From Swiss-Prot:
Cytochrome P450 monooxygenase participating in the biosynthesis of natural products derived from phenylethylamine, including mescaline, a natural hallucinogen potentially used in psychotherapeutic treatments. Catalyzes the hydroxylation of tyramine to dopamine and of 3-methoxytyramine to 3,4-dihydroxy-5-methoxyphenethylamine. This is Cytochrome P450 monooxygenase 76AD131. Its main location: membrane. The gene is CYP76AD131. Pathway: Aromatic compound metabolism; Alkaloid biosynthesis. It comes from the Eukaryota. Highly expressed in aerial parts, in both skin and flesh tissues.
Length: 501
């Protein structure tokens, strides 16, 4: 049943609920300050009719009218949208704990993912435990440094694939190639095995599967807007989402089952990868880690860790092809620092490649991995930037709006890596005009790995090859349109022809 058909069925019931609801007693704070300004909501549906297909742009435009913090109604849900660096700074520095909980979409609740996911759990002892495992076993400097050779090997495989395409004069689907590299890097880190190859359709199928999950979670849903009507959840949450999640879980379950069987046989476990570590922790006496925790942890990292990296790399290559003078500057720096004959870029080289780093950062500014940070929920009434954020309101931080705010960025619509050379801008949650991976206690734990991989892959692609568009297309013909989900991908995949230097 489609979205509007469902709405027509439940509208009379919602109308009745609207008049039967009782207002909660007002707190002292609610009697002294008001909600942020915003467009007048309609009865029942609120401001849902105004969102459109690109809600990040809609909310950014509304911020130009009503200010950097606005209030809306998504059905019955009070929603606060933060659209400036100043408001984000106050939010994360002053109210991070009060806004640390998540507003969990119905799509995430569909298979109970919110009960196990480090991305969606509230800040509880369980969340801290899972976060600690992620920080120590995956993303600590020691662990990242120990796996440099693995990342290098995966980039070399990417290089070999593109060389073969170059020799054949065939174009490369940049996003799909980057996705395969990211997927195999993660699968080798966790499982000591590849999950896809550049020559098979498996990578594209896995990429489509991950995108479907991200798309379903990111799009509006009636169950999120009218939580009092519980049966809508079963009607309006796309049932296909359960199928997508189950397909991923089947892959993980088979790998785990084989690993557990090997541990009980004469072969032993002995891979020394992340899965071995997680299973060992699970088997300890009084362990807090369960098999369900491991399955959902894998779901988190294999969706977020593959899609965001590959999408960002695709946008970086798109921007460089669209701005050939920037491509030339990045290539000149690589040649100067590494030399013409050096093919393999090491992670230790990245610190010397300032323009390359600036290019990655500018891509993250213009095309943030998520246009909205995952939604927060107010655990109490708070005063944010002189306005009331009421208890249980959901709060969206519009990274896209912040990234294109002219009060923070000069000429924000221009792709200009130079802006990151002129000033020292940190992306670890301290410079609030540039928080592509979030800020505060819920900042993305994988940001350091993502940043290393983006520089390594992009540097390799443009140092070893020149690139051109196929079919006689010029840079003016490049399609820069995006499509909305939790991540923003190119609406039309980038296909470019590599030319070996």
């Amino acid at each position: 049943m489609g979205y509007y058909a469902i709405f027509a069925v439940v509208l009379p019931f919602l109308w009745t609920c609207f008049y039967l609801l009782k207002l909660n007693p007002t707190s002292k704070l609610t009697s002294t300050i008001r909600l942020p300004p915003g467009p007048r909501p309609l009865p029942i549906i609120g401001n849902l009719h105004q969102l459109g297909e690109r809600p990040h742009r809609t909310l950014a435009n509304l911020a130009k009218v009503y200010g950097p913090i606005i209030s809306l109604k998504f059905g019955s849900i009070t929603t606060i949208a933060v659209s400036s660096a100043d408001v984000a700074k106050e939010m994360f520095q002053k109210h991070d704990l009060a806004l640390a909980s998540r507003k969990v979409p119905a799509a995430v609740r569909a298979n109970g993912h919110d009960n196990f996911s480090v991305a969606w759990l509230p800040v509880t002892p369980k969340w801290r435990f899972l976060r600690k495992i992620s920080a120590i076993q995956l993303f600590s400097t020691q662990r990242l440094d120990a796996r440099q050779s693995l990342r290098q090997a995966k980039v070399v495989e990417l290089l070999d694939y593109i060389k073969a395409r170059s020799n054949a004069g065939e174009p490369v689907d940049i996003g799909e190639a980057a996705f395969t590299t990211s997927l195999n890097l993660l699968s080798n880190t966790f499982f000591s095995m590849d999950l896809a190859s550049y020559s098979s359709a498996a990578s594209g199928e896995f990429k489509e599967l991950v995108w479907k999950i991200m798309e379903e979670i990111g799009k509006p849903n009636l169950a999120d807007c009218f939580p009092l009507v519980g049966f809508i959840s079963r009607m309006s949450v796309n049932r296909e989402l359960m199928g997508y999640g189950n397909k991923l879980n089947e892959v993980f379950a088979e790998i785990i089952e084989k690993r557990l069987s090997a541990a009980n046989s004469s072969e032993g476990r002995g891979n020394g990868d992340v899965l071995d570590t997680l299973l060992r922790i699970m088997e300890e006496d009084d362990s807090e880690l369960s098999l369900d925790d491991i399955m959902h942890l894998l779901m988190d990292f294999f969706t977020a860790g593959t899609d965001t990296t590959s999408s960002t790399l695709e946008w970086a290559m798109t921007e460089l092809l669209h701005n050939p003078e920037k491509m030339a500057k990045a290539q000149a720096e690589l040649e100067q620092v590494l030399g013409k004959d050096t093919v393999s870029i090491q992670e230790s080289d990245i610190a010397k490649l300032l323009y390359l780093q600036a290019t990655v950062k500018e891509t993250l500014r213009m095309h943030p991995p998520t246009v909205f940070l995952l939604p927060r929920k107010a655990d109490s009434d708070i005063d944010l930037y002189g306005h009331l954020v009421p208890k249980n309101a959901q709060v969206f931080v519009n990274l896209w709006a912040i990234s294109y705010d002219p009060s923070t960025w000069e000429n924000p619509d221009l792709f200009s890596p130079e802006r990151f050379l002129d000033q020292d801008i940190d992306m670890k949650g301290q410079d609030f005009g540039f928080i592509p991976f979030g800020a505060g206690r819920r900042i993305c734990p994988g940001l350091t790995l993502a940043y290393r991989m983006l520089n390594l892959m992009l540097g390799t692609l443009i140092h070893v090859f020149n690139w051109k568009l196929g079919d006689g297309l010029s840079r003016e013909d490049l399609d820069m349109t995006d499509k909305f989900g939790i991540t923003i991908q190119k609406a039309k995949p980038l296909r470019a022809i590599p030319i070996l230097k």
